[in-house]
């Protein structure tokens, strides 16, 4: 089943944190979820050239805090922080509550599945041969310390009449191992022959002991009972 299930979804709460962390009542849940979707859609469209990895949304006390993980923080921030202020105002308007924007830099974009997939997509749109783009991405990831990487492209590869899939892998990608830190993402390239889909799996090693305490959810349980001292 490791081949069928979504690699990120099956690891949530084990070695993967959620991209949205908030709790809501039944009547507010749908509005919050719709607001999250619109905020992500807006930021993804606005920051197409900023090498966007992922967007984390938190909702503390009738406000919204958005953390943007990007390989090019300067593009997001803009000159003297002007662009961030515009984004904050736009997000506050969409969500309907005060907004805060945080920027987190992705130090090694070659080890981020979303950024690797987007890079391959942009190369395919520039008519680079798909095998060359795949091999270059795999070699860069392995050179920077990945334990394993697999890239799959599907569609009318090279302008072929019949669509097909091809994949390239180096190292290990253990999808059945839940403690394995596997970064998975999808991307798409819009070429003159049609859309080509790209899937990327990057294995960074095993995480022993689960998520860090900051991301893990503390289990709710009864307080340990005090032991009575026996008579001597």
UniProtKB/Swiss-Prot annotation:
Residue span, KH type-2 domain: 39-107
Family of the protein in this entry: Belongs to the universal ribosomal protein uS3 family.
Assembly description: Part of the 30S ribosomal subunit. Forms a tight complex with proteins S10 and S14.
Disordered as annotated region, ranges: 213-232
Domain of life according to the entry: Bacteria
GO annotation, cellular component aspect: cytosolic small ribosomal subunit
Record-given protein name: Small ribosomal subunit protein uS3
An example Gene Ontology molecular-function term: structural constituent of ribosome
NCBIfam families: rpsC_bact
CDD domains xref list: KH-II_30S_S3
Pfam families recorded: KH_2, Ribosomal_S3_C
Gene Ontology terms describing biological process: translation
Swiss-Prot/TrEMBL keywords: Ribonucleoprotein, Ribosomal protein, RNA-binding, rRNA-binding
Functional note: Binds the lower part of the 30S subunit head. Binds mRNA in the 70S ribosome, positioning it for translation.
């Amino acid at each position: 089943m490791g081949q069928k299930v979504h690699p990120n979804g099956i690891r949530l709460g084990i070695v993967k944190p959620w991209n949205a962390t908030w709790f809501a009542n039944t009547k507010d849940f749908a509005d919050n979820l719709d607001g999250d979707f619109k905020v992500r859609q807006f930021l993804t469209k606005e920051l197409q050239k900023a090498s966007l990895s992922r967007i984390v949304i938190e909702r503390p006390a009738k406000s919204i805090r958005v953390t943007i993980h990007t390989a090019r923080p300067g593009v997001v921030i803009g000159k003297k922080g002007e662009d961030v202020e515009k984004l904050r105002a736009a997000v506050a308007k969409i969500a309907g509550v005060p907004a805060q924007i945080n920027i987190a830099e992705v130090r090694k974009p070659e080890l981020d599945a979303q950024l690797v997939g987007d890079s391959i997509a942009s190369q395919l749109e520039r008519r680079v041969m798909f095998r060359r783009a795949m091999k270059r991405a795999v070699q860069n990831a392995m050179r920077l310390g990945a334990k394993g990487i697999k890239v799959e492209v599907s569609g009318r590869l090279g302008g072929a009449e019949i669509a097909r899939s091809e994949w390239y892998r180096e190292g290990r990608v253990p999808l059945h191992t839940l403690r394995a830190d596997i970064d998975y993402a999808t991307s798409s390239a819009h070429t003159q022959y049609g859309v080509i889909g790209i899937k990327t799996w990057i294995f960074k090693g095993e995480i022993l002991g689960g998520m860090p305490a900051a991301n893990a959810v503390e289990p709710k349980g009864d307080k340990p009972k005090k032991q009575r001292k026996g008579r001597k």
